[in-house]
Swiss-Prot record:
Lipid biosynthesis among keywords: no
GO biological process terms held by the UniProt record: auxin metabolic process
PANTHER family referenced in this protein's UniProt entry, alphabetically: IAA-AMINO ACID HYDROLASE ILR1-LIKE 3, PEPTIDASE M20 FAMILY MEMBER
Pfam families in alphabetical order: M20_dimer, Peptidase_M20
Record's keyword terms, sorted: Hydrolase, Signal
Functional summary from the UniProt entry: Hydrolyzes certain amino acid conjugates of the plant growth regulator indole-3-acetic acid (IAA).
Protein name, as recorded: IAA-amino acid hydrolase ILR1-like 5
Superkingdom of the organism of origin: Eukaryota
Enzyme superclass (EC): hydrolase
Length: 426
């Protein structure tokens, strides 16, 4: 019995060493392409484009994919999709967003935004470069891909629900799992963090109008004062969180502006206010929307006013909650430990920011996770959506290798399951 046990142990050791060698080789190969990836990112950063206007970015992505011998297809207006691998099932998707923000960049460097009032202040230029890097790595290894990797370059994440348009154009056809990553200024460069279950909030924006009756300030009894009514409405709305919601739930109701009136001696006819509603469950957001409508209309009526609430749909569509699949979350952590090392994988945190990656997750299991970019030496310390936001570009080859490993190892595991006859489900 000793000899077979020894051989088994030797096989395990060789297999483990071989796996480690492959992962080190992947990271080295990604690092060899660092200059190209960083160059792509800088070209995108210098020419930022807002949601559904990513024409230059989209053309750049298509050109780079075609140079790799991949067939790029236009979707969702300015989106791009390409497949690499066998062209057969199983199919796993990797997603990057491409749009910029209406922010004036205040970072002085050679590749500063050349577009006045527009900036890549959320790292989508980095996401695009990382996925293009993965496209190159995968295309070099396509003979060993046991299935198909679908690359999704998505427009309009910033409020435009671009993911929903990608879905309408069929990018998820045949896909059984999807992964996405987002740069995170809170973690050191190259550290990843994932969280299973509800991870990011369902989000919507609302506008409310309180209509009264204008009149001179010295005759309040002849007027219907919408200011008083709006004051009571806004205070009452805060009780929806403190008195109606389970304290263990995560919800946000913010009033972010109030406007109305332009004279000092008259009651205005109308007060308008608005803000955002957020919940870590999509169902919770629907409940909150319903109660906001009831409170605004009811409190306004108490004060002889008319209250109207509009949930914004067109320019700011509602986003569902991001819900990370538990098995795929485990896959991300396992791959992260193997590729980057155990010390580079941390528990993720729930946040109340929205992310339209959630639209994909409504149809297929998926995971959205963070990858750190914090590096004080290069000034990569600012929060996203900040005009001083800056990225440690060392993250780009790491992210490209991670995308590649996530897809490859997922498909390899699926092929192993098929060989032993086991069933795969999420």
């Amino acid at each position: 019995m000793a000899a077979p046990l020894f051989l088994l142990l030797l096989l395990l050791l060789v297999s483990s060493a071989s796996a480690g060698y492959e992962e080190e080789a992947l990271l080295r190969r990604a690092e060899e392409e660092r200059d190209w990836m960083v160059g792509v990112r800088r070209r995108i950063h210098a020419h930022p484009e807002l949601a559904f206007r990513e024409h230059h970015t989209s053309a750049l992505v298509r050109d780079e994919l075609e140079r790799l011998g991949l067939t790029a297809r236009a979707v969702a207006g300015t989106g791009v999709v390409a497949d690499v691998g066998s062209g057969l099932p199983p199919v796993v998707a990797l997603r990057a967003d491409m749009d910029a923000l209406p922010v004036q960049e205040l970072v002085e460097w050679e590749h500063k935004s050349k577009v006045d009032g527009v900036m890549h202040a959320c790292g989508h230029d980095v996401h695009t470069a990382m996925l293009l890097g993965a496209a190159k790595l995968l295309s070099e290894r396509k003979e060993q891909i046991k299935g198909t990797v679908r690359l999704l370059f998505q427009p309009a994440e910033e409020g435009g629900a671009g993911a929903s348009y990608m879905i309408k154009d069929g990018v998820l056809d045949g896909v059984e799992a999807i992964f996405g990553m987002h740069v995170d200024y809170r973690m050191p460069t190259g550290v990843i963090a994932a969280h299973a279950g509800p991870t990011q909030a369902a989000v919507c924006f609302y506008e409310a109008k309180i209509e009264g009756k204008t009149g001179k300030a010295e005759t309040p009894h002849l007027n219907v004062d919408p200011i008083v009514a709006a004051s009571f409405v806004i205070l009452s709305l805060q009780q929806l969180i403190s008195r109606e919601d389970d304290p263990l739930h995560s919800q946000v109701l913010s009033v972010t502006y109030v406007k109305g009136g332009n004279t000092i001696d008259a009651t205005p006819p109308v007060i308008e206010f608005g803000g955002t509603l957020r919940s870590l469950t999509t169902e919770g957001l629907y409940r909150l929307q319903k109660r906001v409508k009831e409170v605004v209309e009811g409190q306004a009526a108490v004060h002889r006013c008319k209250g109207v609430v509009q949930i914004k749909r067109d320019d700011y569509p509602m986003y569902p909650a991001v819900f990370n699949d538990e098995k795929l979350h485990h896959h991300v952590e396992t791959v992260g430990r193997r590729l980057l090392g155990p010390d580079k994988v941390k528990p993720g945190e729930k946040i109340m920011a929205g992310e339209d990656f959630a639209f994909y997750q409504q149809l297929v299991p998926g995971v959205m996770f963070g990858i750190g970019i914090r590096n004080g030496e290069v000034g990569s310390v600012h929060t996203v959506h900040n005009p001083k936001f800056f990225v440690d570009e060392d993250v780009i080859p790491i992210g490209a290798a991670l995308h590649t490993a996530l897809a490859e190892m997922y498909l390899t595991e699926r092929s192993t399951e098929g060989e032993d006859g086991s069933q795969h489900s999420h």
